[in-house]
Amino acid sequence: MAYYWYQSDPQLYQAEVAAMRKFFPSFTINQLQDGSGRLYWRGKVQPGGPGSMEWEIMLIYKNTHPKVFSNSEYGGTVQILPLRPRLKDIADQMMPLIMETYGTYDNAVKHGFGLGLPHIYRDNFGRQEEYFICTADPKYFKGDVTQSTSAASALSWACKWIVLCEMWLNGDSGDEVAMEGNY
């Protein structure tokens, strides 16, 4: 019996590879060297176009891919970890402005800025805590026998998040757009 999703469902694995190669051909697939057996894609995107930031991204499959077991799994079964720039660093830089804007940490949390940026969540990765892009509410992620959210679709949503986040960071959009949630 195969333990990992890509062994037990080689057709899904091939579909994932085909989608990424079609839409994000510069990304490469590898296996984490932490003993977990998890696969990940790594590459760079610049969704804001020339002159915008280039983002180095890892898309990390959970071993449960494509099955989402609860409505609390933000980001679904493909976690999106920006390596450069690092979200935690950006969030730490933004936190004084967030506190100035919202007055208290509790008020910042109430408005969705508890971590310093909209639509991110924290999780352990290796030996440190990292901030991941939350591309959609978990209830919108697909994960059953007939359909699932792919790395390519998760990265597409992440690119939209990056554009909106860059606009917000540059002052080109307000908090209400950043918190809209319809990424």
Please describe what each predicted stretch is.
Residues 1-183:
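UBC/E2-like fold recognition across ubiquitin and ubiquitin-like conjugation systems
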